[in-house]
Curated annotation (Swiss-Prot):
Interacts with the target of rapamycin complex 2 (TORC2) subunit TSC11 and the TORC2 effectors SLM1 and SLM2. Residues 1-24, 78-166 are annotated as: Disordered. Coiled coil: none annotated. It holds the Pfam family HbrB. GO terms for cellular component: TORC2 complex. The lineage of its organism: Eukaryota, Fungi, Dikarya, Ascomycota, Saccharomycotina. This is Probable target of rapamycin complex 2 subunit BIT2.
Length: 545
């Protein structure tokens, strides 16, 4: 049998062999069992005659076993640095299992004590064949604990290889290692949990060897790998769409804080100390000091990292540039829209210089990078923001105005909206949009063509842009119908003003306010249909005075 064992041993195993306790060895030191690691790992083994030999007195030599008898040594102990192949390890393990099952003395006693769950692992670390059967682990529990564990039917007492039950080992045959082809989630989870329970004594021997032979990540056997987190950088969060979850102007405006239709808070109302009559429409603007805390935090965070973004934006990909543009524009609009909600420029949560620097960088991204867009698309984006903000201004005035008679009169309502816009919003927006004015002048080749609908040689400007948006979003919806009358828009508008004077008490002050409004809007150069309507309205209001 010994000859047979030596013949079947792998060529790379060196002096490693499995010792059969029933064969007497001649002039040989206790054989070292097949080693797997240089680490000292405790092993809990049960021998059939352990109870008998534990009762006998032990010699001093038995009380202090030498490390050479324990059976732990490096897999490179022979100095050849040759690793054992997986096939040779499995073959030797299978041979040891067959030899162990062939001896009735060991097999019968082990099966009686362990209720049929004994595997070849129980005799892996045995003593020599002279009958001096020693206990091979100096780190194991007491005799009583081992006996109780054996009799309790626990399936963990013989798991010195993978921590699984002997039934699982017998079903898996000689497959010691769980590879991608034969791994089982349940068995590997059991192995991991068992190995963890004995972590205070040492790591599993075969698990360590498997990690060396088959490198793997510990969590691969449990489930899918989690996405590796992006290495943080000062500005990396601005390159991902999840940051801030920027929204389009329509979305963030109608979901932001402010006195809207359903807010139950009056933003624009008459001053209680002033007589509320239609001819005296002095407004008392109620301040709403609360800024959205999230928007303010995002703005300050962006301003803090703005120098790094400016220094590194040329190395960003096209996708990263698009995401960065969206985040910057979303944060900028969420702050500037407050100017249409009864805020002044000095009440914004950042200095006007910082807000302008942020907009300058945004203009650079949209005009001079790989993610640049056409001038018409860029202007349409700006106009969309201004137009939607003007709708907010109109809604706040119309639905929060105290005098319903004044609001229900179209001429007076337009006059109130114009006053608030031209006396307050217009100049504040000129300040925060100043970087656009600089870009219109410095980069005229980019902005010149296609600004107005008709062919034009006029370069765009911020004041024209604001007035144009006010014309299209506020004025034309009220008075566009006068263009289709038989007598012409100017004549029809004049008759309409006279009727409003008689029915709704339109005063000279109201007409002068409209004269200022239409006169300033008429300064927009061009010959578009919308501009022709403004010219007709201006002529009609002049004739009515």
């Amino acid at each position: 049998m010994a000859t047979d064992l030596n013949r079947k041993r792998s060529a790379t195993s060196g002096s490693l062999s499995v010792t059969n306790p029933n064969i007497k060895a001649t002039n040989r030191k206790p054989a070292r069992v097949y080693s797997v690691s240089s680490d000292i790992v405790p092993q809990a083994l049960t021998h059939p005659d352990e109870d008998v030999h534990l009762k006998t007195s032990k010699s001093p030599h038995d009380a202090a076993p030498r490390w050479s008898q324990v059976g732990f040594q490096s897999i490179f102990h022979d100095g050849s640095n040759a690793r054992r192949s997986t096939d040779s390890i499995e073959e030797e393990y299978s041979q040891g299992t067959e030899n162990n099952d062939g001896h009735s003395e060991i097999g019968s006693s082990s099966s009686n004590r362990m209720e049929g769950n004994t595997t070849s692992n129980d005799s892996l670390f045995s003593s020599n064949s002279r009958g001096n059967k020693r206990r091979l682990s100096i780190f194991t529990n007491s005799k009583d604990n081992m006996r109780n564990r054996s009799r309790s039917g626990s399936k963990n007492y013989g798991t010195v290889i993978t921590g699984t039950s002997s039934n699982n080992i017998s079903r898996s045959g000689s497959k010691l290692f769980h590879t991608k082809s034969n791994m089982s989630v349940n068995s590997l989870q059991s192995s991991l949990s068992t190995g963890h329970s004995h972590s205070n004594k040492g790591s599993n021997v075969f698990s360590k060897m498997a990690k060396k032979l088959l490198p793997y990540k510990p969590h691969n056997s449990i489930g899918k790998d989690d996405v590796e987190p992006v290495v943080p950088s000062p500005f990396s969060k601005f390159l991902h769409s999840s940051y801030g979850k920027h929204r389009s102007p329509v979305q963030f405006i109608h979901t932001s804080t402010g006195g809207l239709i359903d807010s139950g808070k009056s933003v624009y109302s008459f001053n209680p100390s002033i007589n509320n009559n239609p001819n005296d429409t002095a407004l008392s603007l109620i301040q709403d000091d609360a800024f959205d805390a999230t928007n303010v935090s995002l703005l300050h965070d962006l301003l803090k990292n703005l120098p790094s973004l400016i220094a590194n934006y040329k190395s960003f990909t096209v996708q990263e540039l698009f995401v960065l543009e969206g985040n910057i524009w979303g944060i900028y609009c969420s702050i500037v829209v407050e100017l249409f909600k009864n805020k002044r420029v000095w009440q914004l949560p950042a200095k006007i210089e910082d807000i302008d620097r942020l907009l300058e960088f945004y203009i650079t991204l949209k005009t001079q990078t790989k993610a640049a867009v056409t001038h018409s698309r860029f202007l349409a984006e700006i106009e969309e923001f201004i137009t939607t903000s003007l709708y907010i201004l109109e809604n706040q005035i119309v639905f929060n105005y105290a005098n319903e008679d004044t609001v229900n009169t179209a001429l007076k309502r337009v006059g109130i909206i114009w006053k608030v816009f031209y006396q307050q919003v217009y100049y504040d927006m000129m300040a925060v949009l100043l970087p656009f004015e600089k870009s219109f002048q410095k980069n005229s080749n980019y902005w010149l063509d296609g600004y107005l609908s008709e062919p034009s040689r006029y370069a765009p400007s911020i004041d024209v842009l604001l007035l144009k948006c006010f014309r299209d979003s506020i004025i034309l919806p009220y008075y566009e119908s006068f263009l289709h009358t038989n007598d012409g828009a100017s004549k029809s508008f004049q008759r309409y003003i006279f009727s409003e004077e008689e029915q709704n008490g339109v005063t000279e002050e109201d007409k002068l306010t409209l004269l200022q409004c239409f006169g300033i809007l008429n300064t927009i150069k061009g010959n578009s249909r919308n501009q022709r309507i403004i010219g007709e309205l201006l002529e009609g209001i002049r004739m009515s005075i």
